[in-house]
Amino acid sequence: MPLLTRITGPRDLDRLSLEELTQLAEEIRTFLVDAVSKTGGHLGPNLGVVELTLALHRVFESPKDKVLWDTGHQSYVHKLLTGRQDFSKLKMKGGLSGYPSQGESEHDVIENSHASTVLGWADGIAKANQVMERDDHVVAVIGDGALTGGMAWEALNNIAAAKDRPLVIVVNDNERSYAPTIGGLANHLATLRTTDGYERFLARTKEVLERTPVVGRPLYDTLHGAKKGLKDFIAPQGMFEDLGLKYVGPIDGHDLEALESALTRAKRFGGPVIVHCLTEKGRGYQPALQDEADRFHAVGKIHPDTGLPISTSGADWTSVFGDEMLKLGKEREDVVAITAAMLQPVGLDKFAKAFPDRVYDVGIAEQHGAVSAAGLAHGGVHPVFAVYATFLNRAFDQVLMDVALHKCGVTFVLDRAGVTGTDGASHNGMWDMSILQVVPGLRLAAPRDADQVRAQLREAVVVDDAPTVVRFSKGAVGPAVPAVGRVGGMDVLRAPGTGTPDVLLVSVGALAPMCLEVADLLNKQGISTTVVDPRWVKPVDEAMAPLAERHRVVVTVEDNSRVGGVGSAVAQALRDAGVDVPLRDFGIPPRFLDHASRAEVLAEIGLTAPDIARQVTGLVARLDGRYDRAGAEVDQVEAARD
């Protein structure tokens, strides 16, 4: 009987021998490769934390002790050890989340997937424990690049200020950037420095020497400096010790005995401690280890033996952008690129290979990236900052005060905009068009197809006196959606027949094919429809108000929050122009969306062609005085969804 099937909770690990734990680690890696190859998910990071997670759950008593995960995609092993072994629907509707989830287990504390936040959480929980006089331990696991985020260092600065507040910080270093521990002396120093006796010895020595006339303080400083210099020569601990944090490591993150020993010492220390673990991303899976650039950080469905994708769906939005950036780079030497530790996921890998001196990876530091972009623009180049839409939220103040206020020509390219689906609430890029509406001078484009991505990216990088934004969806890009005409700066995708048109349907971005389907359904009901794509949704095109005035109803459809989005902006523009036409906006309701496929999420929130057509039909019927019970029921359903 496999050991893994006998693990129903963390305490089941206590009775296992070292040999059995080693076997369990192998079983977990086999399970992860098999399960994630069928569903997709974050494979490489989880293969690297198997032994670390086993050790954490043997040393600490979750859920009484709080085990917190930064960049929560490292939590698959944690899920397996806390009673969640059904990975058959990982990241699918009704299945396990790809991140920690309070709704799944009492062992999950924070539902995070945005990096560098866990130390702030740990600081707060440790403070609460102290106030409430609880003896619970707090363990924060941070790594996979998250220490490149400024928030992590802000938290460390606060954590270090409380020497008597217990908090264990595990640095999961899978980048192989630190040297291994050198010999027994380093091990001895690491052990000695996290014991109460050693701390008392240092305190007494300092007290005695400082009372000694003339030579006391200089002698203590000399001895302490020599000790520190020796330890810093042996192990890369200086940056943590300079903050006042005790340091254990580096520890082999795949040596269970060493891990348990280090974590046990840290647990007993009684103050903030760094435990530095060296792990190997993708460990035990040869295709991941051979992928030096990414180590299978996140994968779709793959062949487990080879790691090759099972199928490809043609060109995707990201690759279209990446290819066009490469062309722009060849044409314009002043175009540079910025990424926040996402070079390949945002499509800048080809640009980086061709122009290594014109691409800047700022780490998981979107705030710094935006300010650095402002400086680049001030210096005469045009930066293109490619980032997931959900992560731009972190840099809003910098976009507003450093880029827009200074009228800097910076282009932000927002990948994964709108409903992304399987990555859940924290990864849906559903707020960008709302929060960016308030930024003076900013121009925002929402391309509907690959041709428009190329065209609007080129339009954006010409602007040198204001920030520009180009947003697009996740996944396959689909066929081109041709325009049949032009009104102002807007593309007409469907012109009405003869007579007064009923509905002006404003289609935003990738929802254009669905909006054309809505128009077809309305036409079958005898409702004539004009479909327009604004292309640039901020500012609202000046031709919008006079065009709306020639219709009976205006309908906006966007892959963004209904609150403060494009629909709200169009409504305000019509009011300002004195155009009194009913407007119905369709978008994402103001709530967090559970993980499911994009199609399932859109269906659940009523953002489908049949749903929209039914409601617009009811609205037109009310205008005609043909309001009926069916129309009322439609409104009630929509109200419930909101």
Swiss-Prot record:
<feature type="binding site">
    <location>
        <begin position="145"/>
        <end position="146"/>
    </location>
    <ligand>
        <name>thiamine diphosphate</name>
    </ligand>
</feature>
<dbReference type="InterPro" id="IPR033248">
    <property type="entry name" value="Transketolase_C"/>
</dbReference>
<dbReference type="InterPro" id="IPR020826">
    <property type="entry name" value="Transketolase_BS"/>
</dbReference>
<feature type="binding site">
    <location>
        <position position="144"/>
    </location>
    <ligand>
        <name>Mg(2+)</name>
    </ligand>
</feature>
<keyword id="KW-0460">Magnesium</keyword>
<dbReference type="InterPro" id="IPR005475">
    <property type="entry name" value="Transketolase-like_Pyr-bd"/>
</dbReference>
<dbReference type="GO" id="GO:0005829">
    <property type="term" value="C:cytosol"/>
</dbReference>
<comment type="pathway">
    <text>Metabolic intermediate biosynthesis; 1-deoxy-D-xylulose 5-phosphate biosynthesis; 1-deoxy-D-xylulose 5-phosphate from D-glyceraldehyde 3-phosphate and pyruvate: step 1/1.</text>
</comment>
<keyword id="KW-0786">Thiamine pyrophosphate</keyword>
<dbReference type="InterPro" id="IPR005477">
    <property type="entry name" value="Dxylulose-5-P_synthase"/>
</dbReference>
<keyword id="KW-0808">Transferase</keyword>
<dbReference type="GO" id="GO:0009228">
    <property type="term" value="P:thiamine biosynthetic process"/>
</dbReference>
<protein>
    <recommendedName>
        <fullName>1-deoxy-D-xylulose-5-phosphate synthase 2</fullName>
        <ecNumber>2.2.1.7</ecNumber>
    </recommendedName>
</protein>
<dbReference type="GO" id="GO:0000287">
    <property type="term" value="F:magnesium ion binding"/>
</dbReference>
<dbReference type="InterPro" id="IPR029061">
    <property type="entry name" value="THDP-binding"/>
</dbReference>
<dbReference type="GO" id="GO:0019288">
    <property type="term" value="P:isopentenyl diphosphate biosynthetic process, methylerythritol 4-phosphate pathway"/>
</dbReference>
<dbReference type="GO" id="GO:0008661">
    <property type="term" value="F:1-deoxy-D-xylulose-5-phosphate synthase activity"/>
</dbReference>
<feature type="binding site">
    <location>
        <position position="174"/>
    </location>
    <ligand>
        <name>Mg(2+)</name>
    </ligand>
</feature>
<feature type="binding site">
    <location>
        <position position="366"/>
    </location>
    <ligand>
        <name>thiamine diphosphate</name>
    </ligand>
</feature>
<dbReference type="GO" id="GO:0016114">
    <property type="term" value="P:terpenoid biosynthetic process"/>
</dbReference>
<feature type="binding site">
    <location>
        <position position="285"/>
    </location>
    <ligand>
        <name>thiamine diphosphate</name>
    </ligand>
</feature>
<keyword id="KW-0414">Isoprene biosynthesis</keyword>
<keyword id="KW-0479">Metal-binding</keyword>
<dbReference type="Pfam" id="PF02779">
    <property type="entry name" value="Transket_pyr"/>
</dbReference>
<dbReference type="GO" id="GO:0030976">
    <property type="term" value="F:thiamine pyrophosphate binding"/>
</dbReference>
<feature type="binding site">
    <location>
        <begin position="113"/>
        <end position="115"/>
    </location>
    <ligand>
        <name>thiamine diphosphate</name>
    </ligand>
</feature>
<dbReference type="GO" id="GO:0052865">
    <property type="term" value="P:1-deoxy-D-xylulose 5-phosphate biosynthetic process"/>
</dbReference>
<feature type="binding site">
    <location>
        <position position="73"/>
    </location>
    <ligand>
        <name>thiamine diphosphate</name>
    </ligand>
</feature>
<dbReference type="InterPro" id="IPR009014">
    <property type="entry name" value="Transketo_C/PFOR_II"/>
</dbReference>
<comment type="subunit">
    <text>Homodimer.</text>
</comment>
<keyword id="KW-0784">Thiamine biosynthesis</keyword>
<dbReference type="Pfam" id="PF02780">
    <property type="entry name" value="Transketolase_C"/>
</dbReference>
<dbReference type="InterPro" id="IPR049557">
    <property type="entry name" value="Transketolase_CS"/>
</dbReference>
<comment type="function">
    <text>Catalyzes the acyloin condensation reaction between C atoms 2 and 3 of pyruvate and glyceraldehyde 3-phosphate to yield 1-deoxy-D-xylulose-5-phosphate (DXP).</text>
</comment>
<feature type="binding site">
    <location>
        <position position="174"/>
    </location>
    <ligand>
        <name>thiamine diphosphate</name>
    </ligand>
</feature>
<dbReference type="Pfam" id="PF13292">
    <property type="entry name" value="DXP_synthase_N"/>
</dbReference>
<comment type="similarity">
    <text>Belongs to the transketolase family. DXPS subfamily.</text>
</comment>
